[in-house]
């Protein structure tokens, strides 16, 4: 059996961290989302076909050389069904399909017991997903894509949703070939599922344990926390005197931790990172390759991507910081509202409540001057510069230059 993983989309709801990388390549617990998915299935399939599109080179370069993996380029993103159809000439038997942004704990083996099956997850907000209703013997009897509250009340009693994992027979390719485009002008995989439902050929498998469709920035941190709970400690690198390390911490070769720094696991610090002196790395933090956290800086519950520098007297909490950033002295990410309500983020023009504590989302190659403060939920686009003494309380588009124009008054004392 083979597998198809859908990796071609651009992930606009996760801007700015997807401005320069495909969503499946966002690092979670030290490795891309896509690598976590591949590790879940690679021992159960012969070939894995990655359908790539947006920033495809980043996926191809990372996984090139893995004999089990082949790449299929979807030049135009014409829907999930079209992406699956791209694999028709490569696959001769039954196959798995997985969305390239889904993290799941459940074992994939149960899917192999069915001819056609869809993974299901129970959620509190089914209106954000495709809702599925099960009948006798776990057969799927209805599917409604992102229903509103009235549709849920009138048509469904289910809070089971499509979890983005499928086992399909080969004839599904024929169904996909004969589908008409949706209102969005795309060939939808869910329309093929509806054809299977009409002929009573689709079963639902409720997933056990953790599941997360990585669609919004706080989903990234949630998945990061999930994986960090299960790491085993391994300390390498150059650890100087008077460094305190507690909990489960992974420090790779090539890391330097200067004296009087404190690291509280779970934490992963990748090769080439430089920590301290007097740095404080708090739980649920991942520092990717060649990062720098300097004197008296504190990082908590955050992902800091490759080659980013947070040199001194700064605080980064519950945030996602892109690669190649450089923070000036005393750069602060606020992560809590006075009213203790969930932090609100702007997602594609709509204000969406996230979680109680959430900091900032910073794109790649962002530079801040001294004493820059970022309010909870703020996003800063890639290649932007924020000048000294700025309080950033709104989203900043990529390629922006932000500065505050104060007038300095100088008078003689007498």
Swiss-Prot record:
Record organism: Methanococcus vannielii (strain ATCC 35089 / DSM 1224 / JCM 13029 / OCM 148 / SB)
GO terms classed as biological process: UDP-N-acetylglucosamine biosynthetic process
High-level lineage: Archaea, Methanobacteriati, Methanobacteriota, Methanomada group, Methanococci
Pathway: Nucleotide-sugar biosynthesis; UDP-N-acetyl-alpha-D-glucosamine biosynthesis; N-acetyl-alpha-D-glucosamine 1-phosphate from alpha-D-glucosamine 6-phosphate (route II): step 2/2; Nucleotide-sugar biosynthesis; UDP-N-acetyl-alpha-D-glucosamine biosynthesis; UDP-N-acetyl-alpha-D-glucosamine from N-acetyl-alpha-D-glucosamine 1-phosphate: step 1/1
Entry's family note: In the N-terminal section; belongs to the N-acetylglucosamine-1-phosphate uridyltransferase family.
UniProt-annotated binding residues for N-acetyl-alpha-D-glucosamine 1-phosphate: 80, 130, 142, 162
Region ranges (Pyrophosphorylase): 1-208
Pfam families membership: Hexapep (PF00132), NTP_transferase (PF00483)
Catalytic activity entry: N-acetyl-alpha-D-glucosamine 1-phosphate + UTP + H(+) = UDP-N-acetyl-alpha-D-glucosamine + diphosphate; alpha-D-glucosamine 1-phosphate + acetyl-CoA = N-acetyl-alpha-D-glucosamine 1-phosphate + CoA + H(+)
Source taxon at top rank: Archaea
SUPFAM superfamilies found in the cross-reference section: Nucleotide-diphospho-sugar transferases, Trimeric LpxA-like enzymes
Stretches assigned to coiled coil: none
Protein name: Bifunctional protein GlmU
């Amino acid at each position: 059996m083979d597998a198809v993983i859908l990796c071609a989309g651009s992930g606009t709801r996760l801007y700015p961290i997807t401005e320069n990388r495909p969503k499946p390549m966002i690092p979670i617990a030290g490795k891309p989302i896509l690598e976590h998915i591949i590790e879940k299935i690679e021992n159960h399939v012969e070939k894995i076909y990655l359908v790539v599109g947006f920033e495809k080179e980043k996926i191809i370069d990372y996984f090139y050389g893995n004999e089990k993996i082949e790449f299929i380029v979807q030049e135009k993103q014409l829907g999930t069904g079209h992406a699956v159809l791209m694999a028709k000439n490569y696959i001769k038997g039954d196959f798995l399909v997985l969305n390239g942004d889904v993290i799941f704990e459940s074992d994939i083996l149960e899917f192999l017991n069915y001819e056609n099956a869809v993974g299901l997850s129970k959620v509190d907000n089914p209106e954000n997903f495709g809702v599925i209703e099960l009948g006798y013997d776990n057969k799927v009897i209805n599917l409604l894509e992102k229903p509103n509250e009235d549709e849920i009340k009138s048509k469904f009693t289910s809070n089971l949703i499509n979890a983005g994992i499928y086992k399909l027979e080969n004839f599904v390719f024929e169904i996909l070939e004969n589908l008409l485009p949706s209102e969005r002008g795309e060939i939808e995989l869910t329309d093929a599922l509806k054809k299977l439902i009409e002929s009573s050929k689709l079963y639902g498998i409720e997933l056990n344990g953790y599941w997360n469709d990585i669609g919004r920035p706080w989903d990234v941190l949630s998945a990061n926390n999930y994986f960090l709970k299960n790491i085993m400690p391994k300390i390498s690198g150059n650890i100087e005197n008077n460094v305190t390390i507690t909990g489960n911490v992974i420090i790779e070769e090539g890391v330097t931790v200067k004296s009087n720094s404190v690291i509280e696991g779970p934490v992963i610090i990748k090769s080439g990172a430089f920590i301290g002196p007097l740095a404080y790395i708090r739980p649920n933090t991942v520092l990717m390759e060649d990062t720098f956290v300097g004197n008296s800086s504190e990082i908590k519950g955050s992902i800091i991507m490759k080659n980013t520098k947070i040199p001194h007297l700064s605080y980064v909490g519950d945030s996602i910081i892109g690669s190649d950033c450089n923070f000036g002295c005393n750069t602060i990410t606020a992560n809590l509202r006075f009213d203790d309500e969930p932090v609100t983020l702007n997602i594609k023009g709509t204000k969406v409540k996230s979680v109680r504590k959430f900091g900032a989302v910073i794109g790649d190659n962002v530079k801040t001057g001294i004493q820059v403060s970022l309010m909870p939920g703020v996003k800063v686009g890639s290649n932007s510069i924020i000048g000294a003494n700025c309080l950033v309380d709104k989203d900043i588009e990529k390629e922006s230059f932000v500065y505050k124009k104060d007038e300095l008054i100088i008078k003689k004392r007498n």
